Regions:
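Beta-propeller blade-edge and WD-like acidic-aromatic loop motif
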Residues: 1-15, 33-34, 38-60, 74-77, ...
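Conserved beta-propeller blade repeats
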Residues: 16-38, 59-79, 110-126
Length: 152
């Protein structure tokens, strides 16, 4: 998977991050100057940030594993998921990009889906998570009589 930019005016597809690895889950900063995304460039999924429009600069903002980045409304932090934990990394986007130390906000079960599995309110205080599917108890039992005869 790679990331591309599509200009709405001419419908032209231009590369944003194209590598031998997987890049997905792009999230544009509120000031439209940076994009956070998930990549396995290091061998495990991590959250990276690049300028928009793209340059060669890249910042890793997750400590270890991370996926599903989501910018806060004011652009002061990037939320992301690491397994069953949700984290926040404080960031500054002006005058230059700078990332702080990630902090675990909370943890718990979630519904893991392809793509983004959560949302954050405008204040960055409430998270909306997909509920993990309930495991329904079996509602049927199959009984096989004389099952040893079936082996012959």
């Amino acid at each position: 998977l790679d990331l591309y930019i599509v200009d709405a005016a001419d419908q032209e597809r231009r590369p944003f991050v194209v590598t031998e690895n997987s890049e997905w889950g792009a999230s544009l900063s509120p000031n439209n100057d940076y994009v956070a995304f998930t990549t396995d460039l290091s061998g495990q999924y991590q959250i990276n940030v690049k300028r928009f429009p793209p340059t060669e600069e890249r910042w890793v903002i997750s400590s270890g594993y991370g996926e599903e980045p989501f910018w806060s409304k004011d652009g002061s932090e990037i939320f992301y998921r690491r397994g069953n934990q949700w984290l926040s990394t404080p960031v500054k986007t002006t005058p230059e990009f700078e990332a702080g130390v990630p902090e675990v906000l909370f943890e718990g079960p979630y519904g893991n889906v392809y793509g983004i599995s959560y949302g954050v309110d405008a204040n960055g205080e409430k998270f909306f998570l997909l509920k993990q599917p309930d495991q329904a108890p079996p509602n049927e039992i199959n009984i096989v009589n004389n099952w040893t005869k079936e082996l012959n």
